C-alpha cells in the first residue's frame, strides 16, 4: 500500500493535500483522481474548468495529472 497525494491546481491557485490517501495501486489512485476531477466539474462547473488534479507519491514526485474538463459535464 502506498500513500498518494491529490493536489488541485489551476488559475494560479493550489489546494494542496497534506494528508493523502493510502491506496493499493497507482491505478486506484488514478481512478480516485478521475472521480475528483469529475466531482469538481459537476459541483463547481465553470470555476474549475482548466484546473487539474495532480497525483504525487510520498517523495513528492508527480505521477500523473487529471484535467478538470467540460466533457465531464456532458456525462453528468
State each model region's role.
Residues 42-76:
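Short, mixed-charge low-complexity intrinsically disordered segments
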Residues 2-4, 28, 70:
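Intrinsically disordered, low-complexity segments enriched in small/polar residues
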Residues 1-16:
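Short aromatic-glycine-(Arg/Gly/Cys) micro-motifs in beta-strand/loop hairpins
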Residues 25-45:
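A short, charged, amphipathic alpha-helix used as a generic interaction element across diverse proteins
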Residues 15-26:
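A short, exposed loop/beta-hairpin motif centered on an aromatic-Gly-Thr core
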Residues 2-4, 19, 34, 49-51:
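A generic structural signal for short beta-strands and their flanking turns/coil linkers
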Amino acid at each position: 500500500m502506498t500513500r498518494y497525494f491529490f493536489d488541485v491546481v489551476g488559475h494560479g491557485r493550489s489546494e494542496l493535500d497534506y494528508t493523502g490517501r493510502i491506496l493499493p495501486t497507482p491505478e486506484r489512485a488514478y481512478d480516485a483522481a478521475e472521480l475528483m476531477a469529475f466531482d469538481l466539474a459537476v459541483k463547481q462547473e465553470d470555476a474549475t474548468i482548466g484546473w487539474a488534479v495532480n497525483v504525487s507519491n510520498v517523495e513528492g514526485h508527480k505521477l500523473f495529472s487529471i484535467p478538470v474538463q467540460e466533457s465531464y459535464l456532458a456525462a453528468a
